[in-house]
Each structure stands twice: as C-alpha cells, then as structure tokens.
Amino acid sequence: LGAGLINDVRSLRREGAFEAARDSGLAVCIVHMQGEPGTMQQTPSYSDVTAEVSDYLLARASDCERAGIARERLVIDPGFGFGKTLAHNLALFRGLRGLVGLGFPVLVGVSRKSMIGQVTGRPVHRRLAGGLALATLAADAGARIVRTHDVTASCDALKMVAAINERATTL
C-alpha cells in the first residue's frame, strides 16, 4: 500500500513542506484553516467565508505550482470545521459549487463533524445520518473526494445518488 495523498491542514506552510511535497510525487491536498489547530475555533471571523476560502485556496495552489508541484497533483479542501463557526460552515457548504468551479478536485470531510452535532443535537457516535446527507450533497455539488469514517454507508449513499442522477455506470 503506502501513501497516495499528502493532506496537510497547514497547506504546506511549514519550512521544507513545498520541497517534500514536490519531491514525493504524490497528490497534495491544500486545506483551508483560519488560525492554528489549538486556537482556530476561538474567534473565527470572515466577511464572506466562501470568497475568502476560495481566494486562499487559489493563492496556495499558485504557490504550490511556483514551487514545482504540478497543478494536476493538487486537490483543495475548504476545511469544514477548521476555524469556522456553524454559520460559516453552512455558508461554505452552500457555496460548494463555486469552489468546484475553481478547477481543482474538491475534497470534503464532514463526517461526524461538530457542525452535524450543532444542527441535529446528536453526539459524535450518532452523526451518521447527518454525515451521509452532507456527503451526498457534496458529491451532487461536484466534490470529487469525500472523506468519511463510515465508508460502507457513505459508498452506498453515494451510489444511490449517482444512480438517481444516471451516473451509476461511472462508479
């Protein structure tokens, strides 16, 4: 097996990260995160979360390309839950088609996230239904990669959406 993707929540901002990613030959996922992991949820603030996340991801993608990482190796992740309030996460999800329109494969990771708990009132171990709803909406909006804890259930849900959308032959 081995690694097939570098998924860096810091978007290669640490010293040597560009070089390591470039030299690996792997796909690279650029993740939006406002702040740092230990403090990112303290005071997240945006004027327009979708525009700001889009601008950040495009800028980091350009930085990656300048560092010698081919555009074809890049994946973008809007970073649901990474320095965002519930309102930010919901607005960003509503704007997902715009992020897909940036021209990079989009990865969405919302499985068991706190945003599901905030909306449904469910604890982490009871968030499957909310996660499946978001996974199917993300795929329908054009997200190419869905990160999930519940692989079988998510695959089944995504296959059903694809069948309804007459894309079952591509699965």
Regions found by a protein language model. Give the residues of each.
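Active-site-adjacent loop and "lid" segments of alpha/beta metabolic enzymes
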Residues: 4-63, 83-171
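Phosphate/pyrophosphate-binding loops at sites that engage ATP/ADP/AMP, CoA/4′-phosphopantetheine
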Residues: 60-73
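Active-site metal-binding loops of divalent metal-dependent hydrolases
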Residues: 80
